[in-house]
Amino acid sequence: MLKQTLLYTGKAKSVYETDNADHLILVFRDDASAFNGEKIEQLDRKGKVNNRFNAFIMEKLAEAGIETHFEKLLSPTEVLVKKLQMIPVECVIRNYAAGSLCRRLGVEEGKELTPPTFELFYKDDGLGDPMVNESQAIALGWATAEQLEQMKVLTYKVNDVLKALFAEGNMILVDFKLEFGVFHDRIVLGDEFSPDGCRLWDKDTKKKLDKDRFRQGLGGVVEAYEEVAARLGVDLSDI
């Protein structure tokens, strides 16, 4: 598969066309960003760690019957994926209160949410990825009611699979975001799953093992990502 034209440069990944109309190549970079690009740094090895971690998670989800865009790793920083028609709405599941939920609702961080909450956010950096509801997403043509329902069902299924997986590594899956797209009329999980897009805490100490270490200036960001990988048995020895 030949990498061709650069299609898009995101906050932490670059997207390239290939010589196959149904596939793209994603390149994971070492960039770390927070607060809609107001804080940006380069973190050595981050791209390699996230690429390998994402591949591990995508394979686990596929084993659970969840279709993803992941095809195969091409290099330490590159992955071949299906070319999806992306839906510009992020799905967020929260198992515990953290981040913007605490700020919006005055909830104490760490409060368990039973059942887990489900939220939608419109993907637009210029607007700060605002929270939206289903009727807005449908009325504005971002997704159909059927697509949104499928996305919701799949997001909860991902939550069930990954809560159990992280629990095996003595970690709490606090919250996470997912992006979906359409591939040959099917709703398929896209983008990535890594500590960049979720919150993970040590079950006993509540040590943060995710991107909040970067947002909050706690340090040891990549080291925390590597710790998460090690707890799950993700082999990083060759990168």
Swiss-Prot record:
InterPro entries given in the database record: SAICAR_synt/ADE2_N, SAICAR_synt_PurC, SAICAR_synth, SAICAR_synthetase, SAICAR_synthetase_CS
GO terms for biological process, alphabetical: 'de novo' IMP biosynthetic process; cobalamin biosynthetic process
GO cellular component, one term: cytosol
Enzyme Commission code: 6.3.2.6
Recorded superkingdom: Bacteria
Pathway it works in: Purine metabolism; IMP biosynthesis via de novo pathway; 5-amino-1-(5-phospho-D-ribosyl)imidazole-4-carboxamide from 5-amino-1-(5-phospho-D-ribosyl)imidazole-4-carboxylate: step 1/2
Pfam families: SAICAR_synt
Known catalytic reactions: 5-amino-1-(5-phospho-D-ribosyl)imidazole-4-carboxylate + L-aspartate + ATP = (2S)-2-[5-amino-1-(5-phospho-beta-D-ribosyl)imidazole-4-carboxamido]succinate + ADP + phosphate + 2 H(+)
Keywords for the protein's UniProt record, in alphabetical order: ATP-binding, Ligase, Nucleotide-binding, Purine biosynthesis
Cystines in this chain: none
GO molecular function, one term: ATP binding
Top-rank EC class of the record's enzyme: ligase
NCBIfam families, A to Z: purC
Record-linked PANTHER family: MULTIFUNCTIONAL PROTEIN ADE2, SI:DKEY-6E2.2
Similarity remark: Belongs to the SAICAR synthetase family.
Protein name per its UniProtKB record: Phosphoribosylaminoimidazole-succinocarboxamide synthase
Organism: Acinetobacter baumannii (strain ATCC 17978 / DSM 105126 / CIP 53.77 / LMG 1025 / NCDC KC755 / 5377)
Lineage: Bacteria, Pseudomonadati, Pseudomonadota, Gammaproteobacteria, Moraxellales
